[in-house]
């Protein structure tokens, strides 16, 4: 358990009064993830009292998982659950949503409900984000997000997840598709508006464009991709959850011409966080290394 104060950050064991100072090497308030290290080498023995866990394989729909919690005496409390689907949500800050796991479980959070490990075969596969025991529903930070966070955090230069700020709508209405000059069948999402300082706009995407694919992966008419392990998933996972600032993605788009015909084209987008950094009020002002 980590405790923060004006003096600094400390880590303690639930069933012990011992605390040690730690340094926060990377912190992401959007994803509620942090990477810590001991501040003093002399406290290395403190870690011997902890049980390490490893990051397991990414779960699939239908997999059984276990929520781990610990009471004030350090005793474990476990609750089972089943991964049912994914859901786009931003539970920690008022920023762009992530793709989170939707887990059916009656887990009742002891403190806050966020940050508790979710295990499968005694390996970490997710972290709790929010719990609703009455609905038997829990949202969880995904394996993809944890892996991506650790990969960048270990590099020593953590900058956060890409954010573009583009607002889109689905293309399920056949009348709307006809108005846009699109084929009767097909997929994609319609770009309603986007910030001029965002990565999509800087790459040439404009309001009225239809994004049909990302890196060659087709989107359905709701703007979803078909993930082999998770089923229908928001395309955001390709340019936010699993990506890093500086990554380049290729968008397959259609743009309606003056003749009313929608023409296909491709655009390469260099992902960044300029949509947040350009806002007058930044919802996540402390995304960089503390």
Describe each PLM feature range.
Residues 10, 14-42, 70, 240, ...:
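Conserved catalytic-core segment of clan PA serine endopeptidases
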Residues 143, 202, 213-252:
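PDZ domains, with a preference for the canonical peptide-binding region formed by the helix
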Residues 10, 14, 53-77:
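Short glycine/Trp-rich loop-beta-loop segment that forms part of the substrate-binding cleft
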Residues 107-117, 169-213, 217-220, 290:
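PDZ/PDZ-like domain segments forming the peptide/carboxylate-binding groove
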Residues 39-51, 76-140, 184-192:
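Active-site region of chymotrypsin-like
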Residues 1-8, 12-13:
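Single conserved hydrophobic/aromatic residue that forms the stacking wall/gate
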Residues 148-190, 272-290:
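PDZ/PDZ-like peptide-tail recognition elements
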Residues 42-46, 51-55, 61, 222-223, ...:
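C-terminal, low-ordered peptide segments at domain boundaries
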């Amino acid at each position: 358990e980590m405790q923060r104060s004006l003096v600094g950050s400390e880590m303690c064991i639930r069933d012990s009064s011992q605390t040690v100072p730690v340094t926060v090497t990377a912190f992401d308030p959007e994803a509620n993830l942090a990477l810590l290290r001991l501040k003093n080498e002399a406290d290395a023995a403190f870690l011997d009292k902890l049980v390490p866990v490893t990051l397991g394989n990414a779960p699939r729909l239908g997999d059984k998982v276990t929520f781990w919690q610990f009471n004030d005496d350090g005793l474990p409390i476990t609750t089972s659950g089943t991964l049912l689907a994914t859901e786009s949500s931003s539970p920690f800050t008022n920023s762009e949503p992530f793709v989170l796991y939707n887990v059916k479980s009656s887990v009742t959070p002891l403190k806050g409900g966020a940050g508790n490990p979710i295990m499968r075969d005694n390996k970490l596969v997710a972290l709790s984000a929010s719990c609703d025991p009455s609905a038997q529903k829990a949202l969880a930070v995904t394996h993809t997000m944890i892996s991506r966070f650790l990969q960048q955090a270990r590099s020593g230069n953590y900058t956060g997840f890409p954010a573009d700020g583009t607002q889109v709508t689905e293309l399920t209405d056949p009348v709307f598709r006809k108005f846009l000059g699109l084929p009767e069948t097909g997929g994609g999402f319609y770009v309603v508006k986007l910030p001029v300082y965002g990565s999509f706009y800087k790459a040439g995407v404009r309001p009225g464009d239809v994004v049909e694919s990302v890196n060659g992966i087709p989107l359905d008419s709701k703007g979803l991709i078909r993930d082999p392990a998770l089923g229908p998933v928001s395309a955001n996972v390709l340019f936010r959850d699993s990506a890093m600032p500086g990554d380049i993605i290729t968008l397959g788009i259609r743009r309606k011409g003056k003749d009313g015909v929608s023409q296909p084209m491709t655009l390469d987008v260099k992902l960044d966080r300029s949509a947040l950094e350009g806002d007058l009020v930044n919802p996540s002002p402390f995304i960089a290394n503390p």
